Structures are given as C-alpha cells and as structure tokens.
Amino acid sequence: MLFQRRLHFHQFFGKTRVTGSLSRQWYSKLPSKLADIKKLRSETNASMDLVKQSVEEAGVGNLELAREILKKKIVQRGGKLAEKSKNRTAKEGWIIQCISEDGRKAVMAEINCESDFVAQTTPFQDLARRIASTFLHYLPTNHSSYSVEATLKNEILKHQAYVSKNHEANEKDVSSNVSLEEEIVKMTSFTGEKVQVQRLHCMNARVPSTAIGIFSHGAKQSSPLQQLGRIGSMVQINSDLSTRKGLSNQIAKEIVAQDPSSTSELLSFRSLVDSEKTIKDVLGQSTILEWVRWERGGN
C-alpha cells in the first residue's frame, strides 16, 4: 500500500522525486506560481494556456514581465486568428451610438462579431462602447453629416482607445494605453471570432438652432450619451424651440419604429406618441435636416 501511494505521487507530480515527502524546492515555488497565474488570469481574462506560458517564461514572482509576455502572446494569437477569419461572415453584434455632452456631435457605428453568444458578453459590449467613444473623440467636425470612409476609419483605429468612465454620470472620457486596433485583435484572440467595425456615420450640429437626436431599439444599459441596440437612428433637426433636444430624440425614435424610405414619407406618418398627429404636425415649424437609420447586419 505504501509503495502504491508513492507511485501515485510520483506519477502526479511528474519528475518530482517523492520519498515520503515533497521536494522542498518544488513545494515552496508551487503556491507562488499558482498565485501568479490566478492574478494574471483575473486581470486579463486571457486563456489559461497563454497565462501559464507567460508566468513560466517570466519566472515566478515576476508579474510585470509576465504581463508584457502575455500581451505579446495575445496579439500574436489574435493576429493569426484574424488572418484565418478575415473571409468569414460577421453579422452579429450591435449598433452603438455616442453623443457628446453638449449634444453637438454624435457617432453611430456597427460593430460585428460572428455569434450572438459573443455579442451578449460584457467584454464585447464594452469594446463597442470604447470604439464609439474613440471615434466620437477623433472624427472631424467640418461637415454636418457624413459616412466615415475606410481610410479615415483605419487611421483612427490606430489611435489610443478612449474609455468612458461613466456616461450616465457625464464624466470625461479618458485615454487608455492601447490602440483600438489592439483592442479588436485582443477580442479576436479571446473569442476566436472575426470582429470588425463595419460602418460609421458622424453628425455635427454646426448651427446653434440645430440639434442631434439618437435612439436605439433593444438597447442594453442605455444612457443619455450612449445607446447600444439592434436598430439605431440619428437625426438632425433645425428648430427655434428650446425643447429641440427632446424633439430630436423623439423623431429619432419615430424613425427607428416606422422605418421610412424618405423624409417626405416620414412626415406623412402618424406619430407613435400622439396618433392624432402626423410627424409633420409634431415638428411644427421645425424641420428635419438629415437622418440615418441602420439595422444590425444590414447594408
């Protein structure tokens, strides 16, 4: 029986010599190694194999070096997976909108992945919010409404990501130490799925009498400054009313719900808020300058 126990310990601990007690050297290092792996894993949520490799290469107790090694491994794996998945279809994900605190600038983006399972995760939704926040920060304000071309999009993806601390509290965005491009590669590394910024649109209220409204259907954890859903719209109106901001948001909601093919058709629709009135009646002397409506996975 004693021989069997020793044989069992020898097989379990590999090359560690067991003669009734564990090697002191092995025993002293094990708790520290496991602690390093646990800490790094909780910090990054990276795969266990990459975390373990990084800790072993850095050496026990050298967490700073392990973090650097892990970061490189994640990027390497993400790059390989991105190359393999580049021809795959990614139609799941979210329409994400972000508007500045003063309401003068807004961005709408479609962020895609391959499965609804990944889209529903908090890390992916947080990434979508960081992407919208970053483009809101960097996109130019020299046009009232424009679709973002691939060249400008790719240039901004190389910038450091801007992270919103708390949009509900209207706190300032703060810069992270990694680029959006790196953030997307990391997400691909973690999920094994293709992740992409499919399209972007920016609006700027360049005249004091104009206001931008946003609305998302099926929004998750929406706030006045950020909304994330399956269908989204942005609209810019011209109005002398002091309530122009509330009016623009109401029109954005009507656009999402009624899916008009043109502005003239939208104006003829009955309002969802007051069925006795058309959208034209709701607007009164105000006018719709431009609007955009997207559905996730659309063109």
UniProtKB/Swiss-Prot annotation:
One of its GO terms (biological process) is mitochondrial translation. The keyword Ribonucleoprotein does not apply. One of its GO terms (molecular function) is translation elongation factor activity. Gene3D superfamilies: DNA helicase RuvA subunit, C-terminal domain, Elongation factor Ts, dimerisation domain. It is found in: Mitochondrion. GO terms for cellular component: mitochondrion. SUPFAM superfamilies: Elongation factor Ts (EF-Ts), dimerisation domain (SSF54713). Associates with the EF-Tu.GDP complex and induces the exchange of GDP to GTP. It remains bound to the aminoacyl-tRNA.EF-Tu.GTP complex up to the GTP hydrolysis stage on the ribosome. Belongs to the EF-Ts family. This is Elongation factor Ts, mitochondrial.
